[in-house]
Curated annotation (Swiss-Prot):
It is a single-pass type I membrane protein. The active site is at residue 634. It comes from Danio rerio (Zebrafish). Disulfide bonds join 42-95, 138-181. The modification Phosphotyrosine is found at residue 665. This is Tyrosine-protein kinase receptor TYRO3. SMART domains: FN3, IG, IGc2, TyrKc. InterPro entries: FN3_dom, FN3_sf, Ig-like_dom, Ig-like_dom_sf, Ig-like_fold, Ig_I-set, Ig_sub, Ig_sub2. One of its GO terms (molecular function) is ATP binding. Pfam families: I-set (PF07679), PK_Tyr_Ser-Thr (PF07714). PANTHER family: TYROSINE-PROTEIN KINASE RECEPTOR (PTHR24416), TYROSINE-PROTEIN KINASE RECEPTOR TYRO3 (PTHR24416:SF279).
Length: 874
């Protein structure tokens, strides 16, 4: 009861409030001539500060031409003005006030705009056949009314005024003609837009035709030309396999859109395409033939007739080449691209070995004995990838194969031998029994206490513990005598080395921290480079020791020097593991240092003067190597080390070669190369010179200026050659001065003889270094020890048919035409390029340290871990 009473009192109070507020003035109807001013007014009383809103045709009006005037504290007046009335201002207007959630509205008023007629329908262009009749429409309205319309056709008045809306009937014309209409009322005359009557015709030739090739599909696009004033309905596409070859059936597509996708085309094939379009009159001429080439694909079949020939010196493998041939009237594709190489993989003892690539359909492998009981398979490779593997072939000695074929004839001999053995056994038993009787008879007369006339010592011990392994010497390796003589005076016994944690792993092995004791019990901290454990020939060891032999002759502050060579003897293994002993570099490799300056836990700034000093150190070291006829072939920031004085030393000579004659070295064996640092001619012909080291020096300068970024970001290794041959090069880093970029850019000339020498680079960098102000004396941030107390370190990885354009930066006097041509693949050379190839002698994760602490033979365990094989993605 009390609740109902409260609601009743509230409603009474609300009604009293509603009755207490009201509009005292309302807007009134007005008819205004177009262009004049109009003003509407409202007055409201009952509220102290009411919010009065103007409405037009149900929408709020937001305008600066509104005014509010206070007549008294509870009486307000507002005005809405339009300075220049146009037709769009005509409509219904009123005022609104919100009070206690209710909307109070004034009575509406209409504004009518009077003027010359305004168009509701203007004449539009017309397309018609010649002589075909058609209608033209024109509609206009006031106020004021009435409105009459006059037609003009071809510049002449057609008939008299007719009421709006007006429809003009035209019997037909034979050529294009202009027209317009003129509506009039009491205020004046309006003139419509000028329309055109077009005569329909056949469409013209198409505009631009384009295509996009993706895998085995092509998306064809074209733009229509003049349509003949008639909408295009269909287009006809003709496709043929190259000019003059068989034409495929026509394809008719509805348009728009003006595109079509051809699917399932032949890979690595030439095609030609042309298009025409149709309207209701006829067809356009065909567009010119557009040629395109589908990309390569991985082969669809494996090589057949895979056989081997085993001799005492070598193993020869051969197989049939893949072809494209007609089979039952249908083209059967096997190769599906340009053959790049044949990939040979082999397995021995259940372990996969490094695959090999060969240009021809035959492989000659030396050292036939090491391939006994090995299984081989071969696959063909194009630029798109490798096809399926062939059936495996098991390599067995000829005697074993003959034994297998003759095994059935051995049963007779086996049975005969068994019979003979039984008879001999029975005879021996009889003889032994007789001999035993004679022995027993003789022992009865033996003197007691007599000495035994014969005694012996066991020639073999059955102790289960392995005996201590002897120290290995160079004589046990089977290397050539010159290399052995060169390393004899730097051979260090393994017992003088105490191996510690792993510093990093690379393609050819690992690097460990170690402590080297001398004969007088003093010692020093060193770094030991250890070859992988899967070596199985003296040639593998010889390759590693050649690097040490190179470094033995190096005596330069910017080239790492050799301390010695040691050999790790393995139980039950014929060959030891070579270990190269090098100075321990406190600050690690240059790439990791630069990377930590940007991305470390505590980033630090490296001045431009110090960056140039890094470049100078590397250039001086490389100048020293070039004077000694050494080609490094793997110059990069990751292979440059920082000693305790922050001087850079060129290191890692695993790919180095000494030039004995001429000025170039041709790569002729399987090796894994850092593609993004390799010069253009080296990628094409496997030729390496000092000028190719200059190219790599330019890339290293780019690494230094970008603080350790990876070169060619976004470009895959398999795309590098095509990227460079088009004239593209590394872009100028954001903070790199133009003069420094000009120096590094000069290192990337496509013509090797146009690149600067290392001595010239030193002169240029010294001039730049001299221009800079001396760096501050105190730069503690530069002396950052990347090693932490617990052995952990930060990770170092961040991981056309047109002719190439030879740009101005690489123009050089005397360039021969043949110097601009390179072969994509060198004939007769095994190809093995690819991968990101980042083997860094740098920080390791704590898990490796933990493993080396708890392993009884840390070397044998850790160096078994290998990085994934990196072969060119062909």
């Amino acid at each position: 009861m009390e609740v109902s009473l409260c609601i009743l009192l509230f409603l009474l109070h609300f009604n009293e409030g509603i009755h207490g507020v009201r509009f005292t003035q309302k807007p009134f109807h007005q008819t205004v001539t177009q262009g004049n001013m109009v003003r509407l007014g409202c007055a409201f009383e009952g509220l102290s500060e009411p919010e009065i809103i103007w409405m037009k045709d149900g929408e709020k009006l937001f305008s600066t031409d509104q005014m509010y005037i206070t007549l008294d504290p509870y009486h307000w007046e507002t005005f809405h003005s339009v300075k220049s009335v146009q037709q769009q201002d005509a409509g219904k207007y009123w005022c609104e006030v919100e009070y206690h959630g209710a909307i109070i509205s004034s009575e509406p008023a209409w504004i009518t705009v009077a003027g010359v007629p305004h168009f509701g329908v203007e004449p539009e262009d017309v397309a018609a056949f010649a002589g075909e009749s058609f209608n033209l429409t024109c509609a206009a309205s006031g106020p004021p009314e009435p409105v009459e319309v006059l037609w003009w056709l071809g510049g002449e008045q057609n008939g008299d005024f007719t009421p709006s809306p007006s429809v003009l009937f035209v019997k037909g014309v034979n050529e294009s003609i202009k027209f317009h209409c003129e509506p009039r009322n009491a205020r004046g005359i309006s003139v419509s837009r000028t329309g055109t009557v077009h005569i329909k015709a056949r469409p013209d030739s198409l505009g631009r035709t384009g295509h996009h090739v993706s895998d085995f599909n092509i998306t064809l696009t074209w733009s229509p030309g003049f349509t003949g004033h008639s909408q295009l309905s269909t287009c006809t596409i003709q496709l043929s396999r190259g000019p003059g070859e068989v034409k495929l059936p026509d394809v008719v597509v509805e348009v728009p859109p003006f595109q079509h996708v051809f699917e399932g085309l032949r890979s690595y094939s030439n095609y030609s395409v042309r298009v025409r379009c149709d309207n209701e009159v006829g067809s356009s001429p065909f567009s010119p033939w557009v040629d395109f080439h589908t990309p390569q694909a991985a082969p669809s079949a494996a090589p057949k007739n895979f056989t081997f020939d085993l001799s005492e010196q070598q193993l020869t493998l051969s197989w049939a080449t893949l072809e494209q041939e007609e089979l039952r009237g249908r083209l059967q594709e096997e190769l599906r691209g340009r053959l790049l190489a044949y990939k040979l993989q082999w397995n021995q003892g259940g372990e996969s070995q490094d695959p090999l690539l060969f240009k021809e359909n035959v492989a000659h492998l030396s050292g036939a004995g090491r391939f006994f009981n090995a299984t081989f398979q071969v696959a063909a490779c194009t630029m798109a990838g490798c096809g399926p593997w062939s059936q495996p072939v098991l390599v067995m000695p000829v005697s074993a194969m003959q034994a297998q074929t003759q095994r059935g004839h051995m049963w007779v001999g086996l049975l005969f031998g068994l019979l003979v053995a039984t008879m001999v056994g029975l005879l021996l038993i009889v003889l032994i029994r007789n001999r035993g009787k004679e022995t027993q008879f003789g022992s009865a007369f033996a003197a007691q206490g007599a000495e035994v006339p014969v005694s012996f010592t066991a020639a073999r011990s059955f102790n289960r513990q392995f005996p201590e392994l002897p120290e290995s010497t160079l004589d046990s390796l089977g290397i050539n005598s010159d290399l052995k003589a060169k390393l004899q005076d730097v051979l260090i016994f393994e017992r003088l080395l105490t191996l510690g944690r792993m510093l990093g792993k690379g393609e050819f092995g690992s690097v460990r921290e170690a402590f080297l004791k001398s004969e007088n019990n003093s010692g020093q901290k060193v770094a030991v480079k250890v070859l992988k454990t899967d070596i199985n020939s003296s040639s593998d060891i010889e390759q590693c020791l050649k690097e040490a032999a190179y470094m033995k002759d190096f005596h330069h502050p910017n080239v790492i020097q050799l301390i010695g060579v040691s050999l790790h003897r393995r139980a039950q293994q014929r060959l030891p593991i070579p270990m190269v002993i090098l100075p321990f570099m406190k600050h690690g490799d240059l790439h990791t240092f630069l990377l930590m300056s940007r991305l470390g836990d505590e980033p630090f700034t490296v001045s431009q003067q110090i960056l140039i000093q890094f470049m100078l150190d590397i250039a001086r070291g490389m100048e020293y190597l070039s004077n000694k006829n050494i080609i490094h072939r793997d110059l990069a920031a990751r292979n440059c080390m920082l000693n305790e004085n922050m001087s850079v030393c060129v290191a890692d000579f695993g790919l180095s070669k000494k030039i004995y004659s001429g000025d170039y070295y041709r790569q002729g064996s399987v090796s894994k190369l850092p593609v993004k640092w390799i010069a253009l001619e080296s990628l094409a012909d496997n030729v390496y010179t000092t000028q190719s080291d200059v190219w790599a020096f330019g890339v290293t300068m780019w690494e230094i200026m970008t603080r350790g970024q990876t070169p060619y970001p976004g470009v895959e290794n398999s795309e590098i050659y095509e990227y460079l041959i088009k004239g593209e090069r590394l872009k100028q880093p954001p903070d790199c001065p133009a003069d420094i970029y000009e120096i590094m850019h000069s290192c990337w000339s496509p013509v090797p003889k146009c690149r600067p020498s290392f001595q010239h680079l030193i002169d240029q960098l010294e001039l730049l270094w001299a221009k800079l102000n001396p760096a501050p004396v105190k730069e503690p941030l530069l002396y950052v020890n990347l090693e932490e107390e617990d052995g952990e370190q930060a990770n170092s990885g961040t991981r056309s048919s047109e002719e190439p354009s030879w740009g101005v930066p690489w123009q050089c006097a005397g360039i021969e035409e043949d110097e601009k041509d390179w072969l994509m693949v060198s004939s007769g050379a095994a190809l093995a390029i690819g991968g990101d190839y980042r083997y860094i002698i740098g920080p390791s994760v704590s898990a490796i340290d933990e493993e080396s602490r708890h392993s009884e033979d840390g070397l044998s365990e850790d160096i078994r871990e290998e990085e994934e094989d990196v072969i060119i993605n062909v």
